[in-house]
Amino acid sequence: MTNLPSFFVPFVGLILPAIAMASLSLHIQKNKIF
């Protein structure tokens, strides 16, 4: 259980910006199409 935060925090720190970037790029692509 002690190793969980040291693995979980960088994982979330990498995954959340990746999801934000992906949704942002999809939003920009939709705006370019319409």
From Swiss-Prot:
Presence of keyword Chloroplast: yes
Annotated Pfam families: PSI_8
Any one GO CC term of the record: photosystem I
Presence of keyword Membrane: yes
GO biological process terms held by the UniProt record: photosynthesis
Sorted UniProt keywords: Chloroplast, Membrane, Photosynthesis, Photosystem I, Plastid, Thylakoid, Transmembrane, Transmembrane helix
SUPFAM superfamilies: Subunit VIII of photosystem I reaction centre, PsaI (SSF81540)
Record-stated family: Belongs to the PsaI family.
Entry function: May help in the organization of the PsaL subunit.
HAMAP family associated with the record: PSI_PsaI (MF_00431)
NCBIfam families: PS_I_psaI
Descriptive protein name: Photosystem I reaction center subunit VIII
Lineage summary: Eukaryota, Viridiplantae, Streptophyta, Embryophyta, Tracheophyta
Gene: psaI
